[in-house]
Amino acid sequence: MKLFELQPAPGSKKLPKRKGRGHGTGNGKTAGRGHKGQNARSGGGVRPGFEGGQMPLYRRVPKRGFTNIFSKVYTEVNVSALNAFDDGTVVTQELLKEKGIIKKINDGVVILGNGELKKKLTVKAARFSKTAAEKIEAAGGKVEVI
């Protein structure tokens, strides 16, 4: 077999429908748009959420709640993810980002207790859950709130 002999599997390449190219195609004249009306025109159609003049759902449903501008968003990391580090490592928020465990630090990192920790680490983070702190200390590590 040579490179120039390669071809796609039969039936894997389908030609697009050529609309408005004669009635023999089954898609001639109106090109599948029907006769006249808003949807037959170029740029025709209604905006998303428009219900034909009836009061739309997004306006019938009441507004609720607000976004608290003072809320803190923490990036969550489980203790099982900390096994990626070597024994005796000082794990910081920046190191977690560098290693690719988290994408963004946000307002800080919170360590949660899901999974098992098999390494002895010193972990520095904004917050720790009770179980996470217990598991880190049980593995012989240290917990430091920053």
UniProtKB/Swiss-Prot annotation:
Assembly notes: Part of the 50S ribosomal subunit.
A biological process term (GO) from this entry: translation
Purpose: Binds to the 23S rRNA.
Species classification: Bacteria, Bacillati, Bacillota, Clostridia, Eubacteriales
Assigned keywords, A-Z: Ribonucleoprotein, Ribosomal protein, RNA-binding, rRNA-binding
InterPro entries documented for this protein: Ribosomal_uL15 (IPR030878), Ribosomal_uL15/eL18 (IPR021131), Ribosomal_uL15/eL18_sf (IPR036227), Ribosomal_uL15_bac-type (IPR005749)
Biased composition (Gly residues): 42-52
Encoding gene (name): rplO
Protein family: Belongs to the universal ribosomal protein uL15 family.
UniProt-annotated stretches for the region Disordered: 1-57
Xref: Pfam families: Ribosomal_L27A (PF00828)
Protein name: Large ribosomal subunit protein uL15
This protein's GO CC annotations: cytosolic large ribosomal subunit
A molecular-function term among this protein's GO annotations: structural constituent of ribosome
